[in-house]
Amino acid sequence: LTGKKVICLNMPIRQIKNEYDRGNEHIEWLKKNYPNVTSAEVNLTSIFEEMEHTYDNDIQDFLTMANTRARLRMTTLYAYAGHHKLLVAGTGNKVEDFGIGFYTKYGDGGVDVSPIADLMKSQVYALAASVGVTSSILNARPTDGLFADGRTDEDQIGATYDELEWAMLYIENKENYELNKNQKVAMQIYQSLNRA
């Protein structure tokens, strides 16, 4: 939308096929609709596997290795950004970044600019729909793509973004109405992550 040079990187690490295909579809849509957008693919699988062979087995739990993937991608983003004299743009929104801290420190949280950080998740969807982002992106269950088992953000967090956004706004707006059972669960999840 700005007309500035943009390079989209697809950085698969043993990526699940539908995640990989959806990412490529979105990159192709961006290139078709915005002449300032180019792309590159950097398959990081072999580098990640070398790290797995190097690390002691006892530290290779799901979360450690998921965060390792995010940090490997961040390093790659900065290699491209540095070479092309560009900035790394983040994709975190207000709910993820400031509401529950759902990002990897020095991974997807390691960015130069955060253009959608002040938008609630629902606003991100509205913005995406208004510029014509494809339905496969808009309708996909949000995932960070960092786990080999394909878990979604909701699987990891225990609540949907709609529920988390509701809880965040309930607190911000100093609401004071009686909560139903589902709202209480969502509020508990939100508050536990927000205070962490």
Q: How should each PLM-predicted stretch be described?
A:
Residues 23:
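Conserved SAM-binding loop
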Residues 19, 73:
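Conserved donor sugar-nucleotide recognition element shared by glycan-biosynthetic enzymes
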Residues 4-7, 14-15, 26-30, 34-46, ...:
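ATP/NTP-dependent adenylation/nucleotidyl-transfer catalytic domains that generate, transfer
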Residues 1:
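Walker A/P-loop NTP-binding motif
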